[in-house]
Amino acid sequence: ANLRRFVEETRQKGGIPVLFNSVVRRCWYAENLKNDDDEKLRKTVFDGEEKINSDTLIDTHGAYVVAPRCVAQELNVPFVDATKITHDIETSLGIKGSRSLHMWYKPGEVPSIPKGRMDNTHYNVYGARIIAGALADAIGKAVPALGKHVRHYDYVVSAEGRGNFMTL
């Protein structure tokens, strides 16, 4: 219902609605993660990943990623498959390389996170930039009228996520 409302309201205001499904979680665990608590799942780490038992990125969203595609087809709205795009990026980097996209920090590495973090859901600044760029390109392909506005800028942000310095 909310996706349909979003599309209707966007069209009423003269906008171009584009629907996305979810980005993937960095989850290489073939063990069945029977956990409907998103916060616990976000923090799921099996002893620093020594127990990884899959070389395949495992879906953690289930049917949730299908609904936006169905609504997009039903309402004739452009659709961006963020699940596939991010799955391809994560798998191209592999188990260890994909950490570079996420909030994986050792204790003391980032002042604002003194205890460190092993977060397989949220992107760090580098990961956010990579994913945002890929998704912006996908919007440009899905909606050529918007594609001419897609830009990729260089920018500098400190490890703490502070700063707003761009070069054109």
Task: Locate predicted features.
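Alpha-helical cap/lid subdomain in secreted, periplasmic
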Residues: 1-147, 168
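N-terminal secretory targeting modules
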Residues: 142-168
